[in-house]
């Protein structure tokens, strides 16, 4: 060999063979690697399917949670519309909703991250899917070759089926002929049964006719006997007629005796008597003979009819005998035909047995051929099933990828939708929070105005009391009546909380009817007079909400002063001097301008204020008097642009404090003057006689200094009661020196 004929000392043939073998080895390794990766890909797909199912379940759970939160939020909105004072609950629910929104946002971010990961995996799977499409093309070519083979097998099976159908057609023809023979045989049997039944019917008819014949024969014998008797009677009558010919001459002489003859013709027993007297009964005998002739004629007619009937019976008897003979001949012919058909049936059954044997032999031959063909077909079907499994697996993968892509799109849409909903709910929560804040501000302003108005009311009531004591002292300066010098007691700052006072104003719709505090005698309000009454305490216990429950309510805010205290005592916590000393001028803030002045004259007492001027809020639907509506409208106009309705004010803000304990008055009052109802308050003249002065009943009741509740101040909450009970000690009951004397008229 030449040195240039082979590279590096190896011949070219070995190099080419090694290259070809290496190429095939690389192809084999690549194919095995692809099969392994496809199996790993299936496992990954299962894992991804499990992960997706878990994510979908989590999504469903989140949707359920979100629906529950949405329902709670809707219920919260309804409750907020129904209860204007439940703002703290809305704040807590808004915080919970914000927390849930934060959780949902976190979960959405996690889901977005998972979606990105799944999109990357989808891209990888698409690249793998393109490779699988190439494999599918190769598989489709193999499927076409297998389909050609299956077509050839189907043609062979069709030929076998054609031969099988021919045998089936021959078998069906034989079965049809046999069925026709069976039908003819059954018809003949039915006709035979019918003929036998007809023969039985005819036999019954013949027996009946024989009975009729016997009866007719008996009647014939009886008729013959009757005829013989009649003939004998006729003979006797003829003999007597011959004897009567001799006495014809005597008939003319005895015409006068006709009346006697009519009486003697009723019975045949008198015939002998007429014969003994021929001249008298000759005519009657002739008449009797005529009657006998007529009866004989009738008997002859009956005899002729009987003869006719007998002849007809003989004719029917002959016809029946002929019909019975015909039926017997038909029965014999039918029996011969039946034997002929039975012989034919036996022949056909023998033919059928032979044909079935031939059919079974042909069937066995065809069955053997079919078994061989089915084996070949099963082998080819196994190959086709493997290919179909590959195709179905690939199609399932395609469908799963498409479904996943659709689920991802839907999931993105739901995420955007819920993000929009979360933004809307956040806006609603912010709006609710701002509305609650504005409502709280309005409530605080209204509380201040209410306290100021109540202070005015206390001053007016104090003036009314003084006017009741001294009806002619009308011009009384305002500065002469300090809180410490008032007969109603000390400053309202030292009163107990609004929860322990008797309510002057009517309660709200949520609170129920008016109730009095059990801690004070006779309710402890302005209208209480005299010592306490134990049944009042029992009446207050009938309420569903007791004063103890209200005192221990943790949702109420603390108050620095009672609801009747002026606004400067609510806004500023000041140190007040002990009772008996005057207030410094520098400590008092400037007073507000009076915003509520009533057109009242002298009132007969605080009880009338409570009974006439304070209508119940439970009757706000038209039962409020016009004077009160005008006064309420005036107060609303003076309160500015506040849009909080009067019914939303808590009932405890409209209650009077128990600090104003008036001195007990006379149990029997004097006559009252006529009532003037033109103003918002009831106008009356001065009472007659005037009550005794207040100094007669002893000194004013003492009070204890206020005590602040330890701890930080609590935020106000818009409930039925705005203020929490303070830690004040209750007042001691009034100690009258003696009861006043009854006025005399």
Curated annotation (Swiss-Prot):
Membrane topology, record value: Single-pass membrane protein
Cellular component per GO, a single term: endoplasmic reticulum exit site
Name of encoding gene: CTAGE1
Coiled coil (UniProt feature): 84-254, 290-411
Biased composition (Basic and acidic residues): 538-558
Tissues expressed in: Testis. Not found in tumor.
Family: Belongs to the cTAGE family.
UniProt biased composition (Low complexity): 512-521
Protein name in UniProt: cTAGE family member 2
Bilayer-spanning residue ranges: 13-30
Subcellular location: Membrane
Chief site of localization: membrane
Keywords associated with the record: Coiled coil, Membrane, Phosphoprotein, Transmembrane, Transmembrane helix
Stretches for region Disordered: 508-589, 611-654
Residues the record lists as Phosphoserine modifications: 267
Superkingdom: Eukaryota
Single GO BP term: protein secretion
KW Heme (keyword) present: no
């Amino acid at each position: 060999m030449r040195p240039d004929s082979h590279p590096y000392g190896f011949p070219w043939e070995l190099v080419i063979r090694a290259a070809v073998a290496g190429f095939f080895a690389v192809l084999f390794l690549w194919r095995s690697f692809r099969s392994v990766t496809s199996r790993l890909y299936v496992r990954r797909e299962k894992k991804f399917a499990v992960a997706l199912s878990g994510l979908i379940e989590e999504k469903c759970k989140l949707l359920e949670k979100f629906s529950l939160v949405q329902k709670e939020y809707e219920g919260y909105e309804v409750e907020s519309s129904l209860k204007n004072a439940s703002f703290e609950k809305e704040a807590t629910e808004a915080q919970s909703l914000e927390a849930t929104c934060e959780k949902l946002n976190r979960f959405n971010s996690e889901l977005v991250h998972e979606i990105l990961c799944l999109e990357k995996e989808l891209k990888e799977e698409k690249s793998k899917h393109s490779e699988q499409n190439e494999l599918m093309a190769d598989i489709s070519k193999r499927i076409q070759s297998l389909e050609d083979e299956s077509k050839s097998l189907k043609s062979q099976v069709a030929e076998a089926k054609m031969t099988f159908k021919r045998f089936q057609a021959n078998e069906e023809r034989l079965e049809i002929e046999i069925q026709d023979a069976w039908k003819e045989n059954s018809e003949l049997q039915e006709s035979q049964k019918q003929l036998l039944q007809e023969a039985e019917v005819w036999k019954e008819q013949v027996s009946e006719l024989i009975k009729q014949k016997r009866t007719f024969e008996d009647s014939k014998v009886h008729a013959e006997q009757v005829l013989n008797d009649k003939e004998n009677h006729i003979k006797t009558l003829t003999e007597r007629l011959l004897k009567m010919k001799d006495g014809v001459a005597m008939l003319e002489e005895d015409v006068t005796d006709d009346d006697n003859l009519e009486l003697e013709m009723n019975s045949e027993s008198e015939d002998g008597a007429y014969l003994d007297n021929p001249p008298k009964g000759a005519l009657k005998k002739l008449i009797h003979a005529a009657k006998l002739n007529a009866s004989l004629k009738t008997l002859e007619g009956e005899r002729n009819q009987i003869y006719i009937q007998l002849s007809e019976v003989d004719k029917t008897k002959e016809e029946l005998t002929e019909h019975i003979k015909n039926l017997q001949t038909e029965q014999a012919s039918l029996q011969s035909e039946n034997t002929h058909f039975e012989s034919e049936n036996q022949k056909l059954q023998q033919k059928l047995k032979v044909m079935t044997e031939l059919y079974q032999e042909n069937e066995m031959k065809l069955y053997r051929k079919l078994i061989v063909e089915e084996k070949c077909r099963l082998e080819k079907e196994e190959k086709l099933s493997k290919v179909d499994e590959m195709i179905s697996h690939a199609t399932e993968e395609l469908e799963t990828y498409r479904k996943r892509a659709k689920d991802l799109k839907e999931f993105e849409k739901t995420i955007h939708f819920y993000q929009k909903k979360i933004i809307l709910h956040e806006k609603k929560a912010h709006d609710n929070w701002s509305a609650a804040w504005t409502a709280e501000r309005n409530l605080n302003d209204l509380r201040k105005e209410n306290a100021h108005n109540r202070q005015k009311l206390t001053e007016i009531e104090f003036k009314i009391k003084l006017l009741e004591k001294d009806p002619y002292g009308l011009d009384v300066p305002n500065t002469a009546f300090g809180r410490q010098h008032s007969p109603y007691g000390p400053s309202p700052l030292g009163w107990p909380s609004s929860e322990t006072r008797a309510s002057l104003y009517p309660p709200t719709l949520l609170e129920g009817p008016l109730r009095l505090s059990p801690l004070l005698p006779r309710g402890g309000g302005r209208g209480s007079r005299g010592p306490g009454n134990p049944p009042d305490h029992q009446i207050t216990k009938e309420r569903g909400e007791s004063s103890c429950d209200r005192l221990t309510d943790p949702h109420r805010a603390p108050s620095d002063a009672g609801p009747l205290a002026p606004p400067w005592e609510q806004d500023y916590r000041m140190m007040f001097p002990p009772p008996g000393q005057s207030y410094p001028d520098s400590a008092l803030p400037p007073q507000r301008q009076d915003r509520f002045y009533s057109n009242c004259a002298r009132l007969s007492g605080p009880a009338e204020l409570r009974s006439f001027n304070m209508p119940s809020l439970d009757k706000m639907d038209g039962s409020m008097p016009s004077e009160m509506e005008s006064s309420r409208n005036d107060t609303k106009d003076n309160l500015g642009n506040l849009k909080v309705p009067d019914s939303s004010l808590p009932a405890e803000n409209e209650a009077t404090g128990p600090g104003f304990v008036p001195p007990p008055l006379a149990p029997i009052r004097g006559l009252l003057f006529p009532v003037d109802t033109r103003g918002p308050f009831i106008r009356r003249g001065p009472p007659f006689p005037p009550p005794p002065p207040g100094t007669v009943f002893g000194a004013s009741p003492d009070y204890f200094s206020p005590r602040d509740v330890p701890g930080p101040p609590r935020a106000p909450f818009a409930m039925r009661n705005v203020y929490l009970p303070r830690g004040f000690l209750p007042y001691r009951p009034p100690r009258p020196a003696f009861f006043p004397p009854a006025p005399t008229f």
